[in-house]
Amino acid sequence: MGETVRFGISMDDQLLESFDRLIEQKGYANRSEAIRDLIRAAQVELDWEEGEKEGVGTVTLVYNHHVRDLSDKLTEQQHAHHDQIISALHVHLDAHNCLEVLVVRGKARDVRRIADELIGVKGVKHGKLVMTTTGEGLH
């Protein structure tokens, strides 16, 4: 980690009040930590947009396991990407619906492609990709 540098920020007083409320709601110790977190979040988002850096994402799927061949199709997709899908959690939500959470690691563009393939399988009721970082290069 590098040397800490102090700098000033100018902003509208109403925006600052809004920011201070956000800091309190999120439980940050101070403005500096909140600003550092915002910068990190922007950096991670930029890495995902560029698509070349390695990242990690969770793909959450909700589906009715009674839909013909759906479970098999999802399993086939997961096996096709066994090098990138590093973990899977399967939960029976009720007598019909299942939740799967898959942890996918790889280049950001590949993680997004795999998520799109899984979410796009006919019969998936809801799917969502949440993207994050491996932490490498993030200060």
From Swiss-Prot:
TM segment ranges: none
DNA-binding recorded as keyword: yes
Gene3D superfamilies tied to this protein: ACT-like. Chain A, domain 2, Met repressor-like
Co-factor binding details: Binds 1 nickel ion per subunit.
Stored SUPFAM superfamilies: ACT-like, Ribbon-helix-helix
Cofactor annotation: Ni(2+)
Xref: NCBIfam families: PRK00630.1 (NF001884), PRK01002.1 (NF002169), PRK02967.1 (NF002815), PRK04460.1 (NF003381)
HAMAP family cross-referenced by the UniProt entry: NikR
UniProt similarity note: Belongs to the transcriptional regulatory CopG/NikR family.
Protein name per UniProt: Putative nickel-responsive regulator
